[in-house]
Amino acid sequence: MFDSLVDFLKTNIDELNGHELQISNEFKEHHNKDSKYIIKNWLFSSPEYRKWRITRLDGGKNIQVFNTVAYPNFDSELPILGADILWFGTAKKLLAILDYQPLIQENKYLEKYCSSLGMIKKKYSAFDNNKMKNIYDSKKYFSPWVIICRGNKLNLDRDLNDVFHAFINNYLNLNKSNPVNQFLNLEEIKINQIKYDKYSFEKDPADKLFKSFFGEKWTKKFINKFLFTLNNEIIL
């Protein structure tokens, strides 16, 4: 499950003249003790994106997880793309959170870079769940148009691929339009990406999930060395 999303991203990254980066074997594929849970990771870079990572967790019928985060280069003030998609097989429940995660919360910045998400939410009403907005901090790295779905198998089978494709294509089109930085300079962009990683290192809900499957030692290393690598950077 979710392999089609991985393939879709790989195709798009390839079209951006992106290339896969080498990562350590312990992150490339990792099994828990009885191999009931298997996690696979990919890391890419392209001329426009300094880091684009993909994570797939296969927990059989219990749980399936897909995550991707794209960091633009430090010379671009574009938001960070973030997507978390979870399928709980036993309960037949889908949870999806997709957003263009803003570097700042200034209204004009949000309107310029994030408001187009509203068109996707309008087209797919199941992915416009305002009741779940308490699961994230709207004053930090989330936009007012964050896409949230707490759905079922129908949403998984019928809607998810279309929503994800629209989400990715729209984001890539933002970059292709070559927007001029209006709000942040290079140093401010780098600082805000560092702050994003530090915030995510502390707040990412996947921490508990990974610890329960793979243990605390591996999870801490994984989050620090693969997911949020700018967490250890010092802001002067």
Curated annotation (Swiss-Prot):
Record keyword Transmembrane helix present: no
UniProt GO MF annotations: 15,16-dihydrobiliverdin:ferredoxin oxidoreductase activity; cobalt ion binding
Under the heading InterPro entries, the entry gives: DiHydbiliverdin_OxRdtase (IPR023658), Ferredoxin-dep_bilin_Rdtase (IPR009249)
Q: Which reaction does it catalyse?
A: 15,16-dihydrobiliverdin + oxidized 2[4Fe-4S]-[ferredoxin] = biliverdin IXalpha + reduced 2[4Fe-4S]-[ferredoxin] + 2 H(+)
Q: What is its EC number?
A: 1.3.7.2
Q: Name one GO biological process term.
A: phytochromobilin biosynthetic process
User: Gene3D superfamilies from the xrefs?
Assistant: 3.40.1500.20
Cite the Pfam families for this sequence.
Fe_bilin_red
Q: Which UniProt keywords apply?
A: Oxidoreductase
**Signal sequence, renumbered to the chain:** none
Q: What HAMAP family does its record include?
A: PebA (MF_00792)
Q: What does this protein do?
A: Catalyzes the two-electron reduction of biliverdin IX-alpha at the C15 methine bridge.
Describe the family membership recorded for this protein in Swiss-Prot or TrEMBL: Belongs to the HY2 family.
Recorded protein name is 15,16-dihydrobiliverdin:ferredoxin oxidoreductase
